[in-house]
């Protein structure tokens, strides 16, 4: 153990950070069991229980090796959903927004197992300049963020994937979404979008949704921001751009259950950090999330009680 340099400052003890890390470590065995439990995993993938445990452990290990904006448990949720897609259904996995490649590393591992390509779209230059009319972009830069922050160089990302993941299944597409996504080609069985802004989410939906296969998955990182996620319930938006009903979003506001302590959508944005959100949300193509029950529009509404019961 190397001796401390004279005069070196000792890092202050942070109890909330310690508790979060301790909880994550101690709950990992149970999380691995429950998150990998699925009777819908196809036998052709050969994912026995020991193999699922090893995959989950690699996700957990990689989470401490490569910086990422999403928890390894969320990555494991995506992996299990991918294993539920029949291997006969052709299509790639697409990641939009990869930062330094933490999620990319883990997604590449499950793509290697399932025999699918992982297509990674990112500017590799950090946050884009704000677009007119984008409230999240305006709020983000008003709070001190700058264009270019959260950027990981292409060489850094590919280096991380080569070291901890499966680089051979990956292709990388450098540029702003509005320039690269219109050129996407091929079916998509699962997409993961960590894109921050309204304008970026719109680019992903407009250019990639038509390529999502029926019953394919779209995962979203910004599930805590309810107005941001409301596009998945907007009848106007989906009718205007896709002529269909909105698909909805499972986990809006709080995320899907991954075993992390969580009480408040705003907790992930600031104090108290001990309650920070560590999850993900998703939708499936073909789902319909539209309200169709308006009892006052029907004469002799079946929801009305019989006259004998009302008197």
Regions found by a protein language model. Give the residues of each.
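Boundary detector for helix-to-coil junctions that initiate low-complexity/charged tails
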Residues: 1-41
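An N-terminal domain-start capping segment
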Residues: 20-21, 25, 80-88, 92-95, ...
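Generic surface-pattern signal
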Residues: 24-31, 35, 39, 43, ...
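Class I SAM-dependent methyltransferase Rossmann-like catalytic core
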Residues: 39-89
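S-adenosylmethionine/decaboxylated-SAM
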Residues: 52-67, 90-311
């Amino acid at each position: 153990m190397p001796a401390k340099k004279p005069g070196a400052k000792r890092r202050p003890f942070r109890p909330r950070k310690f508790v979060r890390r301790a909880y994550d470590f101690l709950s990992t065995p149970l999380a691995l069991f429950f998150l990998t439990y699925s009777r819908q995993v196809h036998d052709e993938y050969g994912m026995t229980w020991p193999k699922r445990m090893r995959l989950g452990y690699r996700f957990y290990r990689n989470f401490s090796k490569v910086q990422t904006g999403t928890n390894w448990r969320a990555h494991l949720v995506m992996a299990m959903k991918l294993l539920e897609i029949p291997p006969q259904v052709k299509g790639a996995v697409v990641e939009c927004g990869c930062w330094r490649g933490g999620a990319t590393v883990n997604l590449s591992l499950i793509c290697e197992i399932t025999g699918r390509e992982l297509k990674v779209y990112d500017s590799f230059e950090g946050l884009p300049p704000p677009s007119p009319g984008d409230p999240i972009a305006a709020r983000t830069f008003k709070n001190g963020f700058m264009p270019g922050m959260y950027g990981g160089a292409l060489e850094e990302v590919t280096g991380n994937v080569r070291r901890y993941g499966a680089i051979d299944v990956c292709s990388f597409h450098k540029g702003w979404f509005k320039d690269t996504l219109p050129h996407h080609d091929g079916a998509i069985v699962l997409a993961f979008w960590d894109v921050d802004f309204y304008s970026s989410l719109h680019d992903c939906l407009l250019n990639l949704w038509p390529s999502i296969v029926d019953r394919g998955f779209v995962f979203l990182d910004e599930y805590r921001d309810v107005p941001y996620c409301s596009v998945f319930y907007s009848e106007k938006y989906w009718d205007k751009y896709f002529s269909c009903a909105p698909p909805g979003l499972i986990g809006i506001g709080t995320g899907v259950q991954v075993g992390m302590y969580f009480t408040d959508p705003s907790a992930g944005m600031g104090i108290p950090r001990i309650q920070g959100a560590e999850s993900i949300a998703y939708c499936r193509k073909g789902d319909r999330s539209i309200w169709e029950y308006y009892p006052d529009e029907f004469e002799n509404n079946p929801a009305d009680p019989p006259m004998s019961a009302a008197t």
